[in-house]
A protein has these predicted regions:
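Short hydrophobic/aromatic beta-strand or adjacent loop that forms the aromatic wall/cage
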Residues: 268-272
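Active-site histidine-anchored catalytic micro-motif
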Residues: 1-248, 252-265, 276-278
Length: 278
């Protein structure tokens, strides 16, 4: 069992308080978690900062996910490795505990991903203290409760090859097991610049993201030294979306921590996006 690492810091440690925080995030965004069956998206990008800063931005993606799937697919959550621990591409087979209960791991699907990939390891060390995947779970639990099934992948080796390997392995596993899969890329955008500077720098990456141009997105991150911490997970989502027939991304919300704190001199930027099918 993977125990919470950031409950009480990134989000409330008590069930009632966490539920209230999620409700507040949705209220600020003017959204609801209303189940539908549109099945019109293949992947999403969500931020992973403290809920008080980025929860309301994440709400945009999770509202669309709820509207797309009344029956949950397997959620493959790919997050960057901030701690440096464990395998460079680490897939967890554990169930994950949160204040809202146990998020069950789809161990069969995870093992199939490892079989279908070439560089993906079964490894728990990378996940032990990592927050980028953990903070996604309460929103998903709020939508799907005990029906939720997850496959967490912590990505330390962020490049085109690893991103493609994950995406292609997920698609192959989905086909072999005849199970619907959905990739959530966990990432914040530019860190610790003014809001104006962050928006200017992120615009280059967001343009490539919208056009589903993986090569251009990676080029902009490297060429401009963009501090998008989860660019590898985003590349995985982009490649998977393209494999599933998507031709663009839809930016649902772009904001920064200054929109909450009032300090626009040094911010962290956040983005919610989805990849529409067709």
């Amino acid at each position: 069992m993977r125990r919470p690492a950031v409950a009480g810091s990134f989000y409330p440690a008590q069930k009632a308080e966490l539920g209230a925080q999620i409700a507040e995030s949705l209220s600020r965004a003017g959204l609801a978690l209303k189940l539908g069956n549109a099945r019109d998206i293949a992947a999403a990008v969500c931020p992973h900062a403290g809920y008080m800063y980025s929860g309301w931005v994440a709400a945009f993606s999770y509202s669309r996910i709820a509207a797309a799937f009344s029956k949950p697919p397997v959620f493959v959550i790919v997050g960057p490795n901030h701690t440096g621990q464990g395998s460079p591409v680490a897939l967890s087979q554990q169930d994950w505990d949160t204040p809202l209960g146990i998020a069950k791991n789809d161990a069969e699907f995870g093992k199939e991903i490892v079989k279908c990939g070439t560089i993906i390891d079964l490894d728990e060390r990378a996940h032990e203290f990592e927050h980028s995947i953990e903070v996604q779970l309460p929103f998903l639990q709020k939508i799907y409760g005990e029906r939720l099934r997850i496959v967490p992948i912590c990505l330390g080796m962020q490049n085109m090859d690893s991103a493609k390997d994950i995406a292609e392995a997920v698609q192959k596993a989905s086909a072999r097991l005849k199970r619907e899969a959905f990739i959530i890329a966990s990432s914040d955008f530019t860190h610790f610049e003014s809001a104006e500077s962050a928006k200017m720098h992120d615009a280059h990456a967001l343009d490539a993201l919208k056009r589903l141009d993986e090569g251009k997105f990676f080029e902009q991150v490297r060429l401009r030294n963009l501090t998008i911490c989860g660019y590898g997970p985003i590349l995985s989502a982009m490649h998977y979306a393209r494999l599933e027939g998507c031709r663009k991304a839809e930016i649902l919300k772009y904001a920064n921590s200054g929109d909450v704190t009032g300090d626009h001199n040094s911010v962290v930027a956040y983005c919610s996006a989805v990849f529409p099918l067709g």
